[in-house]
């Protein structure tokens, strides 16, 4: 049998067993895309006349997907959930399987930081929006960044 010289080093994390039927339903309902905060932000961006791609890789060779991408301006937007990404204001600590969730959130934060670094290195502007942020305020921030970036990219 022949094996590739490159070997995947990504560790598979064992999913925790839900502590209750309610927890099980909550875990099943968690979506990787098209969340309510994402939809609200996209709606506001669209009202301002901004056009974008959703759930795409900004850099094809990079195995990371952004929630919203403005290709011509080289701007990526990630809408981070307070629980999943450890929001300092609204992030909550899980009571059941606490150690698993602490590690999971730390890994998410490390991946977020690495993603930011890799995209910046590739010439992209990275914007992170917490799910609790006002879609209107986030839209204004993103609009200003897109305008500035388009001016830089199209010089």
Enumerate the language-model features and the residues they cover.
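Nucleic-acid endo/exonuclease domains
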Residues: 2-155
């Amino acid at each position: 049998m022949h094996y590739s010289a490159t070997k995947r080093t990504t560790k598979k994390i064992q999913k925790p067993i839900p502590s209750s039927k309610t927890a099980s339903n909550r875990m099943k309902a968690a979506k990787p895309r098209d969340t309510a905060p994402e939809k609200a932000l996209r709606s506001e961006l669209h009202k301002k006349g901004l056009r974008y791609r959703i759930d795409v890789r900004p850099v094809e060779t990079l195995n990371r997907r952004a929630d919203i991408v403005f290709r011509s301006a080289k701007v990526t937007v990630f809408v981070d959930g307070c629980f999943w990404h450890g929001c300092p204001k609204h992030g909550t600590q899980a009571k059941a399987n606490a150690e698993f969730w602490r590690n999971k959130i730390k890994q998410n934060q490390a991946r977020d930081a690495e993603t930011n670094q890799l995209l910046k290195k590739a010439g992209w502007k990275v914007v992170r929006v917490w799910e609790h942020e006002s879609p209107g305020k986030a839209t204004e921030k993103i609009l200003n960044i897109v305008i500035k970036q388009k001016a830089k990219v199209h010089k």
